[in-house]
Structures are given as structure tokens and as C-alpha cells.
Amino acid sequence: MHTGGNGAKHLYAALEGSLRRLRTDYLDLFWVHVWDSVTPAEELLETMVAMVRAGKIRYWGMSNAPAWYVAKLATLASVRGVPGPIALQYFYSLVNRDLEDEHLPLAKEFGMGVVPWSPLAYGLLTGKYDRSVVEAAGPRAGGFAA
């Protein structure tokens, strides 16, 4: 996981930190987690391609980014003949199926895999928690916005 945005400096720092902690030379899959609303798609693509070509990562994916931004990345990668995102990671459960509107068609169109996070809706679907308790907790505490 990285903090500080999607610019090259922050992504490389996150990558090197992960490699060090995992005591490995490369990652099979590097997630760009959360779009920063600032970094142009072209810049992010260049950074990710450089990481792949350097042998630091084999593949990369996007988590919690707008569908239009991921589509732009995938299109640029296709046109340029460079490695684009191969997977998407988003909140997806029986409680919230918003992913089906834009992101699943995007994944299908560009041949990307989809990895859901919190498929049990922060535990709500286990039956262990009451919906009002989960909603009241808010997203930071493991709840969700209704």
C-alpha cells in the first residue's frame, strides 16, 4: 500500500518498502490503491511500465479509481503496446453492487480480473452484526455508507 499520491516518487517508495519488507526482488502484482485525483493517466502509466520493465513488478492493477480513469490507462497502454492494468479491486458485496454498473463492463472489455474487497460487507452478511450498528460505525470503523 502506498501513501502520498500516485506520482512516481511515492509509488517507487511504496514499491521499495514492500520489496524490503517481503524480502524479495519483485512483486507478482502491484496495486495502485486509490486514485489521487491529480496524477495524469499518462504519468501513472509511464511509472508502472518502468516498474515492469525494470523487473520490479510483473503486473499491476487499480483499486478504487473511477472507471473512466482506468479505461484511459488501459486504452493508452493498448495503443502504446505497453503493459496496462490487469486487475481491478473494489468494494463488492450483496449489499453494494455498484461495481456492476461501470467497472465490470470495463474489466470485461479490457480483459481485466476483478478482486472484490469486503464481500461480506464489513461482516454484515455474516449475520453477526445488525445493519444499524454497522452503518453507525462509519467507513473508517468498518461500517459503510448506506
PLM regions and their residue ranges:
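Beta/alpha (TIM)-barrel catalytic core signal, keyed to glycine-rich beta->alpha loops juxtaposed to Asp/Glu
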Residues: 36-146
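Active-site groove signature of glycoside hydrolases
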Residues: 19-40
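Short, acidic/polar
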Residues: 6-22, 43-46, 68-75
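A short, mixed-charge helix-start or loop-turn motif at secondary-structure junctions
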Residues: 1, 30, 144-146
